Amino acid sequence: MAEVAHHNIPAVDMINATSRLQLEAAEVRSNKPNWGSYFRSKMIQEDDYTLVTSYENAKSKDERDQVIAANDANGQLAKTMANLITQVAKDQNVRYVLTLFDDMLQEDKSRVEIFHKAAHRQKRTAFSQYLGILQRQDNFIVNQMSSIIAKLACFGVTRMEGQDLQYYFSFLKEQLKNSTTNEYMNTTARCLQMMLRHDEYRHEFVVTDGVQTLVTALNGKTNFQLQYQLIFSVWCLTFNADIAKKTPSLGVITALGDILSESTKEKVIRIILASFVNILNKVEEREIKREAALQMVQCKTLKTLELMDAKKYDDPDLEDDVKFLTEELTLSVHDLSSYDEYYSEVRSGRLTWSPVHKSEKFWRENAAKFNDKQYEVVKILIKLLESSSDPLILCVASHDIGEYVRHYPRGKTVVEQQQGKAAVMRLLTAEDPNVRYHALLAVQKLMVHNWEYLGKQLDSDAQGDGVAAK
């Protein structure tokens, strides 16, 4: 059986927290369609009419089970639901059928297999006939359908695969990207929570840039309930060791660390700490584990843990997580070199004027290390020059490219081969004066041969321009 995320953190039940979809569904249930009129007008078939009215009139789960059993063997239940969803014209009535369908699966998870078996008999998947509904214009219909698809994918033993899975994850990611306009974001997050509890779905989500989409959503303005749901999805992903070791390079730790340093909601704090514990436990490669720990330290996680340790929680899991992380992160700090610190900062993409950037000793001792892993650090710095809009990051990256060139004899050649010279020169026309200043210094270092002369010239330029190096 596939690994499913387990911990004493509430599972996907917390999803039943009131959402826009659930509020609207309550109203939809009270507006039953006039199926008799549809039948008399020959807009639905007699089999569909008989089944849906019998199911509506059933007063208990036992009675509903009897209706389902009577229509299971011949596949009529699955056929009727598909017919009513795809053939009924009015959105209001499609809303009703989808809500009925969702309630049916929520009441008894095993019912999903009825739909999978019926689809199998038709040599198709249960998902394929419903994925097209996600393109409808009515947002309630789209999100209720999405919720049903997630249940079909998670409640039984049949899993979504191939193009169906790619299409569905692509849909969910688009919904996440529209976080400012998507009024059903809690439903989108709920579907992700359900899907990512199953290891079979995690890899596909990651290879289609799902993690980056999650991180972007987390970095946006979200209420704490949605924040919790999105972090829950991240937590689920960290149960997979291959995914856990990618988290330092995908901005996951930094995003969670920023939220941790500001959040006052205990359940948000707990899920972040549980995610950090997973990452450190799952990653076996010493270097990656060390980098992950260092990113946590840079996000002031130790300070948060210190404050939490002063409180007393009636939760042994939380206490264990606080103790484990405190020990691991403290050890990582003690075993830290200046290059480790610098490397982690560069990999995180969040450059600041930390002491190492201005340390002559650091550059003398470590410039050659920029060539490790096929010039990884140089490539990251150049990528930041090309893609970042943050003046501070652009200043520091320009400065570091210049220092690398100054301290490594072949640095100019390496930077030019990686298109770094062009990236720096483009910043000579940047709006921010400090960016222009540091770009100019870097360009001069890329072109000059006499370093003693350059040092005097830079001092003179700085005094003349009156620009402070920030």
From Swiss-Prot:
Gene3D superfamilies (alphabetical): Leucine-rich Repeat Variant (1.25.10.10), V-type ATPase, subunit H, C-terminal domain (1.25.40.150)
Any one cellular-component term (Gene Ontology): vacuolar proton-transporting V-type ATPase, V1 domain
Gene: vha-15
Keyword Transport: yes
Subunit description: V-ATPase is a heteromultimeric enzyme made up of two complexes: the ATP-hydrolytic V1 complex and the proton translocation V0 complex. The V1 complex consists of three catalytic AB heterodimers that form a heterohexamer, three peripheral stalks each consisting of EG heterodimers, one central rotor including subunits D and F, and the regulatory subunits C and H. The proton translocation complex V0 consists of the proton transport subunit a, a ring of proteolipid subunits c9c'', rotary subunit d, subunits e and f, and the accessory subunits vah-19/Ac45 and vah-20/PRR.
Pfam families: V-ATPase_H_C, V-ATPase_H_N
Family (UniProt): Belongs to the V-ATPase H subunit family.
Keywords: Hydrogen ion transport, Ion transport, Transport
Its biological purpose: Subunit of the V1 complex of vacuolar(H+)-ATPase (V-ATPase), a multisubunit enzyme composed of a peripheral complex (V1) that hydrolyzes ATP and a membrane integral complex (V0) that translocates protons. V-ATPase is responsible for acidifying and maintaining the pH of intracellular compartments and in some cell types, is targeted to the plasma membrane, where it is responsible for acidifying the extracellular environment. Subunit H is essential for V-ATPase activity, but not for the assembly of the complex.
GO MF term set: proton-transporting ATPase activity, rotational mechanism
Protein name per the record: Probable V-type proton ATPase subunit H 2
PANTHER family membership: V-TYPE PROTON ATPASE SUBUNIT H (PTHR10698:SF0)
Keyword Ion transport recorded: yes
